[in-house]
């Protein structure tokens, strides 16, 4: 049988545990000003080098999201030297953001093609990049690439996915948690509840819904 939400109230959670979870989320997402206010209000100890690290990561993400992926790559190498050399997937994705910017801003197709040939094509020696390369190169065939079958590559969602991966990689490179504590808690809760639902499926219980669980 499912767990009665009222039973949650029987589990005591210390304030400092909640504070640590909130702080983890704020630091992970580079909310510098909010971190300063939160630390001041709660009396928590600020993590070492926390503010400087957030400021540097925030600059990198800003450049990547605003269309200056080459600057983001440069700053990433300064902050986490060797990261992109060892993480080819991430390096490819960042380079692809610059290519997309050339396409989106209607730069001369020759410039976009030359960039692709010099920076992206070498990845084609590895099979897993071939299909991605074909998708990116196909954008050049359309006068309005946003109407092409690969339009999703031009979206802010794609940029955000790359930035999220970059954030996790930079944090891991610095031996820091690559996921915010709240994200890990939600992942764990979802997996556990899905397993419970499967075990009790014979009782006709509905599949676990995270959205419904958070409303309970």
Segments predicted by a language model, with ranges:
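Short, charge-rich, low-complexity alpha-helical interaction segments
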Residues: 1-48, 53-83
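Extended acidic/polar alpha-helical scaffold segments
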Residues: 56-59, 63, 67-70, 75-216
């Amino acid at each position: 049988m499912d767990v009665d939400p009222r039973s949650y109230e029987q589990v005591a959670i210390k304030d400092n545990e909640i504070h640590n979870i909130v702080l983890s989320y704020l630091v992970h997402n580079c909310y510098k000003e909010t971190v300063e206010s939160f630390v001041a209000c709660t009396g928590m100890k600020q993590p070492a080098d926390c503010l400087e690290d957030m400021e540097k990561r925030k600059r990198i993400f800003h450049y990547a999201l605003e269309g200056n992926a080459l600057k983001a790559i440069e700053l990433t190498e300064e902050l986490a030297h060797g990261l992109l050399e060892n993480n080819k997937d991430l390096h490819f994705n960042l380079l692809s953001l610059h290519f997309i910017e050339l396409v989106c801003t209607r730069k001369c197709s020759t410039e976009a093609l030359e960039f692709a040939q010099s920076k992206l094509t070498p990845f084609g020696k590895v099979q897993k990049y071939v299909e991605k390369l074909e998708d990116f190169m196909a954008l050049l065939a359309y006068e309005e690439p946003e109407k092409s079958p690969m339009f999703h590559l031009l979206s802010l969602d794609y940029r955000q996915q790359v930035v999220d991966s970059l954030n996790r990689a930079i944090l891991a490179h610095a031996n820091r948690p690559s996921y915010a504590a709240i994200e890990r808690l939600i992942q764990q809760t979802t997996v556990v509840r899905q397993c419970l639902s499967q075990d009790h499926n014979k009782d006709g219980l509905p599949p676990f819904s995270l959205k419904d669980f958070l409303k309970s």
